[in-house]
Amino acid sequence: RVCFFTNNSSKAAEDYIEKLHKMGLDISRDEIYTSGEVTCEYVNRVYPGASVFVMGNEKLKAEFIRHGIKLSEDNPDLCVLGFDTELEYWKLYRFCKWLNKGKPYIATHPDLNCPADECPMPDIGGMILFINATISRNPDIIIGKPEREAGEGVKRKFNLPANKIAMVGDRLYTDIAFGFNNGFKTVLVLSGETTEEMVSASDRKPDVILPFVKDLIK
């Protein structure tokens, strides 16, 4: 079985299905899993019935609504930081005000940037630093790769033990660290962010290193 797991909480699963179909891959909805989905599952399990201030775009908000979670920017029970591609300054300020009052603080993932053609896009990692510099708070929990909560979500979703799962990715600090943190086999592909020099300098070595994802089937 195959699962495409993405930390990008600004996209819906349907966006990735469309993208992968254009690449010639016959992928079903059940084979896509996002950090936004795992976050919703976590909120429903740990904070059932809670209202949530979602710092994210409309697609992430729709994911929370799909999971039956009430959204509120007026006295929410907890706050969730997502990859907000519709960021507004005063929305960020309201978010900080609730965090400053001690509301539980969840981040969907920790990535510093999101790959883009001309220049990497600022991602949640930068917003975490921004908020910490403003009110001296870090997330109480981060959900996506490389954290264990996402790994537990994958195991629950596919009803598989850790030793039956292999993590394939191109980032050492999210993808490969995700495998290590959750007891999965790790496969690094060199077609993205990571170079052989970066692997040599890392204290965590992947189980397998391949030039491209397609080499998995050779």
Residue spans of the language-model regions?
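Asp-based, Mg2+/Mn2+-dependent phosphohydrolase catalytic module
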Residues: 3, 9-33, 37-218
